[in-house]
Amino acid sequence: NYNAHLAAYPQVDWEAFARRFVESLGLEFNPYTTQIEPHDALAEAFDAVARLNTIVVDLDRDVWGYVSLGYFRQKLVAGEVGSSTMPHKVNPIDFENAEGNLGVANALLAHFSHKLPISRWQRDLTDSTVLRNMGVALGYAVLAYQSLMSGLGKLEVNPQALQDDLDAAWEVLAEPVQTVMRAHGLPNPYEQLKALTRGKGITQDSMRAFIAGLDLPAPEKER
């Protein structure tokens, strides 16, 4: 408050003076604070970074899985070792590093966003030691982003693996086939496809036989 200022210079409108001074520096004036500027904006920013990091973790895990399934191949890097005992191994290490570093970053960011809005009797200094670690949290996040970009740069699609999986999953045609059946007014398309595909291994021959038996125009069957 301006009590001491007002006692010394009662003729001055201290709030107006403070506003002019702060805004002259290009800053936003906050008329209501405790002994320090509230950390609410910092907490909001840290929460936003943590949400971004969570999205990146989701991407890391998905790409790691696609590499494991063989949908993506990783370009070889000369001199890189994937395993101490398996010389053939090419690890998705960049995505693992990114995920691990983001876990550390988000642990710190969560503490920041929970701690910084709180000040015991509006005057304790526990925020000081916490604020000194902002760079640590953001540094781990930046390392993770760099690892992610490095990993993405090494990826190449494995079309053969995608084609092999697609050729082994004829049941995925259940949705478009039943939609065409509906468009032509055939009865119970969902139930028919459910009976054909649910819990069963569908082959190209069985799907072709089912389509051949439908009362559909020849051009639709050929598609």
Regions found by a protein language model. Name each.
Residues 81-223:
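Catalytic-core signal marking the mid-to-C-terminal active-site face
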Residues 1-115:
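Internal glycine-rich alpha/beta core junctions
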